Amino acid sequence: MNLQRQAEIHRVTNETEVSVRLGLDGSGRCKVSSGIAFLDHMLHQLSSHGLLDLELVAKGDTHIDDHHTNEDVGIALGQALSKALGNRKGIYRFGQFTAPLDEALVQVILDCSGRPHINYELEIPTQKIGTYDTELVREFFVALANNSGLTLHIRQLNGSNSHHIVEACFKAFAKSLRMAIEADPRRGGSIPSSKGVLEQAGDNNTEKSK
């Protein structure tokens, strides 16, 4: 168990270099520089509403496009989340929140299960928000879920403004994650699984936890 619930990840590829420092029991302190302005804005939402202390620096081949950097930020953040959670002892495990932003309404339901899965149902009406390709929202969450071991369901209930839809999504995710990773005082430090174990992302065990 990671008693301090903190993690650092440094990921280097031929396309990107990403450094992440994540604290789960934080106050929402955020210092991020991904080279993608809109992604930075969304990471601030994640940190603020999830009460995560987040430091992130990314350098990538954004002269080509934002795809590699956006995805690798999701990968590194997911790895940091998995590492900080450790064996997931004593947490609530499940979280859900529905966040409004003006006309937009997005619901996120998640399970810190060790079983990576994403069901993504955002219908973003424009291809870009500023210079950010809106198809990259899905790629970010796929990378994060796969590398953190989250079961993640994202549903858009309403919305017509692209910025509002995506921001509501990040806020709902942040609040859901905060609920799921909080300590459950009734659990007394036990693992929230009937099997007594929750896999960490990257584990090779064939039998998954339920």
Curated annotation (Swiss-Prot):
The keyword Cytoplasm applies. Keywords: Amino-acid biosynthesis, Cytoplasm, Histidine biosynthesis, Lyase. GO terms for biological process: L-histidine biosynthetic process. Coiled coil: none annotated. It comes from the Bacteria. It catalyses: D-erythro-1-(imidazol-4-yl)glycerol 3-phosphate = 3-(imidazol-4-yl)-2-oxopropyl phosphate + H2O. Its EC number is 4.2.1.19. The keyword Lyase applies. It is found in: Cytoplasm. This is Imidazoleglycerol-phosphate dehydratase. It comes from Prochlorococcus marinus (strain SARG / CCMP1375 / SS120).
